[in-house]
Each structure stands twice: as structure tokens, then as C-alpha cells.
């Protein structure tokens, strides 16, 4: 029950008539030489941590170590409660939880790297929002997380999820691709539609640079988690509507990796280019020299 690329994954789904989530769950059991109970228990713990990281800052904001972020999630939550939001219930909740998770991370709280700390808000942001709005069970969300895991595995095996190697497109891009695929399955989409959604995300985030102010995982990282979760939602919606992609996921992962390696070092997590060089941002950073 192993696979090296999306094409092989889709073949397994077709042959066994199983969703991506279950193929990935069974792979974890077999490759990890562990038990069904152990794998399920671990994913339940993952969801528990994700919830705490996403919900806590909404109630009790904490300033980040670098002083660049803190309180944004609570502002979004209050704006949603006021009835003046323009994004719609799912997206407003999703960006709130995505930004909240980055606040937790930046204040030394416990998060789940999804796939990295700098992109940790996108997957839980979208899935927790869908759970609240559509009343999905924790078990449903755990299954969706296995789906997200499959997409992350493909990116890590065949490309990268490191900003230092491939820019922010490899971090928030892959995170959003994972979220889009997971959301597509959660909402009843097919395995092929899941890969279309993931491919759509990578295409739309292609070339995004990694330029953290002060070298900290705060700004613009938090903002990009919000925009990443929005792109993931759009991609899932398109895929569920039956819109296909000309470029399959395997090719898009390769393209992302190729583009990332062509980015100059200044735009790959070194804090020597992009937003990291903005005087206004540097003046606000407690950690900047």
C-alpha cells in the first residue's frame, strides 16, 4: 500500500475503491510497522493540538517573541461576530484560525508543523472552519488530515517543503495544497478532484518568496497563512464544481521545485530580500539589528 507519486496514489484509490485518506492511513500502518489503534490515536492527538493552537489566541491574544504579531485572530473573530464580514462564514473562520495558529507558534506555543511551522495555520484553519460550519465530527477531520498527509508526503518525497530550498511557495504553497485536497475529500470529492485542487493551489502560489522579517516566523508569514487558506478554499470549490486542471499534481510539484531552486538566496528564508528589507518592518522588529 505504498506510492511514490500522485499517479500511483490514484491507481491505488481506484484499485481498492478507497479515498486518499484511507490509502494514506493504511500506508502509515504498514510502512511504520505499527497498529491501527496507534495511528488513529496519534492523529487524534494531532487534531487536539491543532484545535488548541487555533482557538486559544482568539480568546487570549499573546504578543509574539519578535513583537511583530499578536491579537490579529481576536480582531478577526470580533469582526465576524459583528456581522460586518465580507468573506463569508467559512473563509472568515478559516483565516481567523490560520492567523491564530501562527500567533501560537510565534509566542512559543505548541503547534503541529503542517508541513512547517511557518505554514502551520493553513490546514487546521480550513478544516476547523469546515467542521464548525458543516458540523463534521472529529473522526471526519482526522480522516481529512490523513488526506493532507498524503499530499505533504508527495511534496516532501519529490520536491521540498522548506522555505530555505524552495521559497514560501514550498511552505505555504504545499500547506494550502494539502488543505485544498483534504477539504475536497471532506466535502465529498473524488481522489482525482483532490489532486486537481492541490495542483490548482501550487499553480496559483508559484514563485512566492520566503522573506521573513528579522528571520522570524511572524511577518509576513501570518498574513500568508491567511491568503493561503483562502486560495485553498477557492481551489477546493473549483474542483468540487467539476473544474479540471491541465497540469496534473505530479508535474506541478516538479514545477514548484524547479522554480524554487531558481529563486536567489536572498528570497529563500535568509531575511536578505523582499519584505525582510522593508525599513518600516525592521524598525518594528524587536529582534532586528
Question: How does the language model describe each region?
Answer:
Residues 1-109, 132-133, 242, 249-289:
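Generic N-terminal targeting/processing segments that precede catalytic cores or assembly contacts
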Residues 86, 113-120, 132, 143, ...:
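Glycine- and small hydrophobic-enriched segments that form the cores of compact globular domains
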Residues 88-105, 140-159, 203-212, 271:
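Acidic-glycine-rich active-site phosphate/pyrophosphate-binding loop
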Residues 103-128, 169-176:
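Glycine/serine-rich anion-binding loops at beta->alpha junctions
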Residues 124-135, 180-188:
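Alpha-helical support elements that line or immediately flank enzyme active sites
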Residues 130, 156, 161-169, 175-176, ...:
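N-terminal glycine-/lysine-enriched basic segments
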Residues 165-176, 219-229:
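Carbohydrate-binding/catalytic loop surfaces
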Residues 181, 185-289:
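Functionally critical mobile loop/hinge segments
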